[in-house]
C-alpha cells in the first residue's frame, strides 16, 4: 500500500510507548520548523492600524456584499478553484453562493438572523469517508443542513468547505462582519507594510500579517477608498506550502439589501441531513480493521498492520 502524505488535522498513534504523528483533513495545521524565523516579527504600528481598520470597517458596516475568485494550491497543483458571492447584513443575516470554476457545482449558505441553512441546488457533494455508495445514493439530492447561528457565534468560513465548490475556508471569515473573531487572531505576531500598489485601478495599501510565528502569513491589498481588501494571499507553511489566493470585486458597503435575500424554506419533500459523525462508522466487534499506511512526522511509513494484537491509541489535535 502506498503511503498517503496528508496534512491538517493531526492524528497521533501511540503504541508501546511510541508516538507517531501525521496529519489529515482540509486545513493545514502543523507548523514547519524549517520555515519559522528565529527572529521575532517586527510589528509596524501604522500597518497594524490598517489591519485593525479593515476589521473595524466590516464590523461597523450596516451591510456588505462582494464577489470573490478563490484558488488554492500546493506543490504547483490546484486543490480547488471557485467563484463565490456573499451578502451580509446586520444584525445577523448572511448569504453565500459558491460554484466550482471547472464543474459549476456548488452550494448556497443562508442565515435568516437565527438559523443557518446549507443546501445544494444540483445535489450535494460526496463526503469521503462518511459516504458509502448506498448512503450517498439515498441522500445525494433534495437534502439540506441546518443549525443555530447566534450573532457572533457562528463562522461562515468553517461552513464554506461543505458547499462542494472546491474551496476550503475564506481567508478572512465573512462572519467577522457579525462580530465573530476567528481563533487565529489571538496568535497574530504583527503586521508590516509592503508599500502601495494598484489593483484594478484602485490604490491599495499592501500589508502582511504573520500568524503563529510565521506558520501562516496573510498578504492583503487593502483599498484606500473603503479600507477593505481587493486581493488576499494566504501562505501556510507545512511540509509543502499551501497557497490560497482571493480576488474581491464589486465590493459594496451599506446598500439596502431586502430581508428576502436571506430567507429560505426547504422545498416540499426535502429532508434534513448531516455529515455522519466518525463514531457512527466504527467497526462492529469482531470486524477486521482495514489496513492503511501513513507518513509519520519524521517521514517514515507507519502501517496499521504493524501493530496487530497491540493497543492503538488515536489522539486527535488541531492547531491553526
Predicted regions and their residues:
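Gly/Pro-enriched, hydrophobic low-complexity segments
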Residues: 42-45, 69-71, 97, 102-103, ...
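An acidic-aromatic
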Residues: 87-170, 236-245
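N-terminal "domain-start" segment that seeds a small globular fold
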Residues: 275-304
Amino acid at each position: 500500500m502506498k503511503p498517503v502524505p496528508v496534512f491538517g488535522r493531526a492524528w497521533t498513534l501511540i503504541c508501546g510507548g511510541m508516538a507517531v504523528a501525521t496529519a489529515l483533513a482540509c486545513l493545514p495545521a502543523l507548523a514547519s520548523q524549517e520555515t519559522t524565523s528565529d527572529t521575532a516579527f517586527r510589528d509596524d504600528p501604522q500597518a497594524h492600524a490598517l489591519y485593525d481598520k479593515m476589521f473595524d470597517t466590516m464590523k461597523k458596516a450596516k451591510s456588505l456584499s462582494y464577489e470573490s475568485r478563490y484558488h488554492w494550491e500546493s506543490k504547483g497543483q490546484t486543490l480547488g478553484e471557485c467563484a463565490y458571492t456573499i451578502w451580509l447584513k446586520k444584525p445577523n443575516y448572511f448569504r453565500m453562493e459558491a460554484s466550482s470554476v471547472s464543474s459549476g457545482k456548488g452550494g448556497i449558505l443562508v442565515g435568516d438572523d437565527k438559523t443557518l441553512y446549507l443546501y445544494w441546488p444540483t445535489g450535494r457533494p460526496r463526503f469521503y469517508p462518511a459516504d458509502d455508495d448506498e448512503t450517498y445514493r439515498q441522500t445525494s439530492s433534495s437534502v439540506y443542513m441546518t443549525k443555530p447561528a447566534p450573532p457572533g457565534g457562528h463562522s461562515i468560513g468553517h461552513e464554506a468547505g461543505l458547499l462542494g465548490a472546491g474551496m476550503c475556508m475564506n481567508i478572512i471569515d465573512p462572519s467577522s462582519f457579525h462580530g465573530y473573531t476567528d481563533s487565529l487572531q489571538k496568535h497574530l505576531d504583527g503586521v508590516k507594510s509592503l508599500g502601495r500598489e494598484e489593483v484594478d485601478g484602485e490604490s491599495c495599501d499592501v500589508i502582511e500579517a504573520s500568524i503563529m510565528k510565521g506558520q501562516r502569513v496573510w498578504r492583503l491589498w487593502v483599498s484606500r477608498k473603503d479600507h477593505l481588501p481587493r486581493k488576499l494571499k494566504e501562505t501556510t507553511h507545512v511540509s509543502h506550502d499551501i497557497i490560497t489566493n482571493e480576488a474581491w470585486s464589486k465590493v459594496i458597503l451599506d446598500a439596502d439589501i431586502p430581508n428576502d435575500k436571506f430567507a429560505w424554506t426547504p422545498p416540499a419533500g426535502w429532508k434534513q441531513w448531516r455529515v455522519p459523525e466518525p463514531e457512527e462508522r466504527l467497526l462492529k466487534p469482531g470486524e477486521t480493521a482495514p489496513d492503511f499506511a501513513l507518513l509519520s512526522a519524521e517521514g517514515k511509513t507507519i502501517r496499521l498492520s504493524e501493530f496487530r494484537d497491540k493497543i492503538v491509541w488515536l489522539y486527535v489535535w488541531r492547531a491553526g
